[in-house]
């Protein structure tokens, strides 16, 4: 009996912790299944959105104040922007969320294509939210 009560308390704690993290996510992220692979602060299957925001907002940045992982990804994104003729990191991130794929982040599972299942306006709104997490 004691074991059951302890298990129930632990389960309730996990549910509450997950719901707090999920509440921070925009409704669009929950509605479109983004939270299955992403959170704002921690890597799940894909990178944490705050890390994505830092890297994409630091494209072209230099100096020792930049986190090495963020710097490495931002350098990759800079090269990708040139290679694909994208004018802004936002344009590339919108394409990445729409079409899926791998290549920007290290040791992550490939992102599934989200378009046309997720509306273009929703993708743009989510990208705006992600990039807004860490402004330059």
Question: Model-predicted segments: where are they?
Answer:
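Sec/Tat signal peptide C-region and signal peptidase I cleavage site
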Residues: 15-22
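Short, solvent-exposed mixed-charge patches
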Residues: 135-136
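Bacterial N-terminal signal peptides that target proteins for export
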Residues: 1-8
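Axial heme c-ligation environment in periplasmic c-type cytochrome domains
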Residues: 36, 42-56, 68-124
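Sequence/structural segment immediately N-terminal to covalent heme-attachment motifs in c-type
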Residues: 23-40, 55
């Amino acid at each position: 009996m004691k074991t059951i009560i302890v298990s129930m308390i632990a389960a309730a704690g996990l549910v509450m912790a997950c719901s707090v993290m999920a509440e921070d996510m925009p409704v669009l992220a929950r509605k479109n299944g983004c939270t299955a692979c992403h959170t704002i602060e921690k890597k799940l299957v894909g990178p944490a959105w705050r890390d994505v925001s830092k890297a994409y907002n630091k494209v072209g940045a230099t100096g020792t104040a930049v986190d090495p992982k963020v710097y490495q990804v931002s350098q990759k994104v800079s090269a990708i922007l040139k290679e694909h003729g994208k004018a802004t990191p936002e344009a590339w991130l919108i394409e990445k969320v729409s079409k899926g794929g791998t290549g920007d982040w290290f040791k992550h599972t490939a992102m599934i294509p989200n378009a046309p299942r997720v509306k273009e306006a929703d993708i743009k709104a989510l990208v705006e939210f992600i990039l807004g997490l860490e402004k330059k």
